[in-house]
C-alpha cells in the first residue's frame, strides 16, 4: 500500500499552465488558441498531476491510498463505515479491505482467491452493508462469477451469492455464502446492493437480484427466504423507509408488449429504447412492501438510476441518474418525483451529457448532498437549504478526485471516496530486456492496461474558499476552455480546410472512412521505428509482419503519442464510437457479468445521445457501417478459417451464406449485409477488404455513385486466435490484417474519391501487449492527400480526439462532455495536398495461411499454450484471460525470450 499526498491548492496554482490553454489570443489558425501544455506531454507520470487518455487531468484533493495486487486490474467499488466508527470497509472487485480511519492504513484484506470455493469469483457492482447483531459486527455484500460448493460437498449450481463476513476488530473472516440461482433466461442472479436490518430481534438482509429482476428478503439465522418478488429491469440499489422498500431499476419497467413502444435486446430480456439511438429510454424506481415484497408502485425517474439514499428525516429520497446527469428527488409521503437536481459540471453552460452521477451521500443535518460524478472525476456538492422541502437547492461547487468516483462515505469532517478507476493503468513493470543495440542488459519499464491498484481518497471537508478554488480547479482539469471551440459560430466565406476551425465551416473532405482494429500497443507494432519513441524489445509485430502500416506511417505520418481511451474491447468500441462510456460499462469492468458488449449488442451500454453514426444521421449525413455494431451469423459447423480461405482462393465464396444483425433499429438500413462481419476470426480480413473494394468500385463506376459521408469499418484479425491449430499463427493473422489495410488504402487512393476522402485507423484498445511509455498508447494512422506530412506527430491525442476530428470535418457538434473537450487533430493535416501520390500495398512477408501446429507436434511451453488457446476460446474477440493471451503472443513471436512477467504474475496463474 502506498500513501500519496497530493499537491495542495497553493501548489496547484504554480502548475496552472500545465492544464490551461497556452494562449487565449483570438485569430490564430489551426486551433492553436485551444492547445494546452498537456498536448505536448506523454501519459507517463509517477505522481499527480496524471493525464488520462480522454482529455482529463487528475490532481485530486486530499490523500489517496492505493491497495491491491498489482498483477491484477483492481477497482474499489463501494465503502461503508463500520459501526465501531474506527474502521472503513471497502468493497473491491476481488474482495473486501479494512482500513483504520485514524491512520488510513490497510489493516486487513479478504480476497476470493484465498478460499478455494470462491477462486475466480468477483464482487458485483456495488452495495455493501454492515450491522451489529448480538454484539457482533457482520458484513454483507454481493458476489458472482463461479459455481460454488458449500458445506457437505453439495454443488449448489449457483454462481451468485450474498457473502456474510464477521469483523472482530482486527481481522475479517468469511461466515457463509447465501447462494442464488439464475432464473432463465438469465445466466446469473447477480445480487447487487445488500441491506442488513434487524427486525423483532432477528437479522435479515434484503438484496436486489440484478440478473433475475427480483428482490429477495432472507432471514440470516436459518437462511430462510422470506420472499422473492419481481422488480423492474436490472435492479441495482435499494433504500428502506418505514414499511416501504425503494429499488432503482437500471433499465426501467419490464416492457409491456401491448403498448407499442420500441424495445431492444439486453442480456436476458428486453428494455424500452429510443429508436434513434438504441439506448435505454426509461429508468424507474419500484416501491414494494418490505414485509411482503408486493409491488405498490413504480415511479419514472431519469436514465440509468443507480445510487439511492434517503434524507436523515426520511422525508425525501434521492436517486442518481447516471445517463441523465441529474438527481431525482422523491417525496416519501406522496411517492412522487418533486424535483430534479442537475449536477453535471458543464450543465449550466451547455447540457453535454456525460458527468455520470453514480454515488450519493448526505450530511446528518440534511443540508448538503454529495454526488460522485464519474466522468467529471469530481464530487458535486449540493446545498439543499435549511428549508429542506426537496425543491430548493443550489450547486455549491465541485471537489477534484481521482478517476471515476463511485462511492462516498462521510466520516466526521472528511469525505472518503472510492475511485473506481484510481489513476488508471499505471502499474510499472521493471524487468530485464535485451534492448536491441544496447549492451549490457538494462532494466526497462513496461505497462499493460490490466495492471493497476485500487484507490480510495480521504478529503478534508472544504470551507467556502477551498470549495470555490476546488471548483475552478475541476473546470481546468476537465479542459473547460475547449468548450469555446464548440460554441463559436461558423464564419461566412471561409475557404475549406482539412479540419475546420469551427463547426459548420467547410472541409475539403466529403467522406470519412473510420477503421477500428483490435488490441495492439504502439510498441508491439511500431516499437522498431526509429522515427518515434519506441522500444524494439517489446515489438513483436514489427516491419516484417506489418510492412503496410509501417510504410503508411512513413508515407503519411507517425503518431507516437496516440492513445486508446479504454482498456478492453468492451470499453474500447464505445470510446471509439461514442467518445465516452456509461456507468453500466464502468461498473462492469473486469467482471462483465451481464455482457461483454464489444460488438454493441446490449442496449444498456449506450449513452442517451448514441454513437457517432447517430450524430451523422441527425445532421443529414449519409452513413455506411461495415461489420461494426452488429452480430454476424452463418453456419459455423460448416465453415472454419481454413475452409473459407480455400474457398476464396478457388473463387467459390458465393456459396457462403451469412447475414448481420443489430439491436439498433435506426442503423439497420445502413449496415452492410455483404461485409462478412466484424468480430469473427474465421473470416480472413482479405474477405473484408474484398467486399469493401468491390463496393467502392461499383460506386465509382456509376456516374452518380457516391461514398457515404461516414463509413465505419471493423477490421479485427490483428486480435489473433492465439496458437489454436484451427487458425493461422498470430503473426499470420496480424499480417492478414496489415495486408487488408494496405489494399483498402490503395483502393481509396486510386479512386475518384481520393481527393476528398480521409481514412482514420485506430485500435479499439491496447490491452493485448506492453508499452514502455503508457499502457494506453496504441497505433493510429491518418491517410489523405492532406496528411502527406512524412513526419512524426508527437501531440498527445486519443480516440476522443479522433472522434472530435471526424465530427469537425463532417460539421457535427460534439455528442457529450468528453468529445466536447477533445482537441481536434489539427497537427495531422496540411493545407498543401499531394494529389499525385497513390499508395501501393506491400505484399505480406508471412504466409497468410501459416497455420498453428497440431498438438501432436508440440511439447513444453508450445503444448501448454496450444491447450490454453483452445480452452479459453481466443478465436472469439476478447474471450478468455487476457494475460494468458499476452503470454501466448509473446511466446509465438519471441520464443523463449524473457517475458515481462513481474507485474503479470507468476506463470502458474495461467493454469
What are these regions (language model features)?
Residues 15-16, 262, 531, 777:
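Residues in and immediately flanking transmembrane alpha helices
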Residues 4-8, 13-14, 55, 287, ...:
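Disordered, low-complexity tails and leader-like regions
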Residues 1-28:
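Bacterial Sec-dependent N-terminal signal peptides
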Residues 10-14, 58-60, 449, 569, ...:
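A generic structural signal for short, non-catalytic loop/turn and secondary-structure boundary residues
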Residues 16, 148-152, 227, 297, ...:
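A generic structural signal for short coil/turn motifs at secondary-structure boundaries
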Residues 23-496:
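Predominantly soluble domains enriched in secretory-pathway, periplasmic, or organellar proteins
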Residues 468-911:
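N-terminal pro-sequences and low-complexity stem/linker regions of secreted or lumenal proteins
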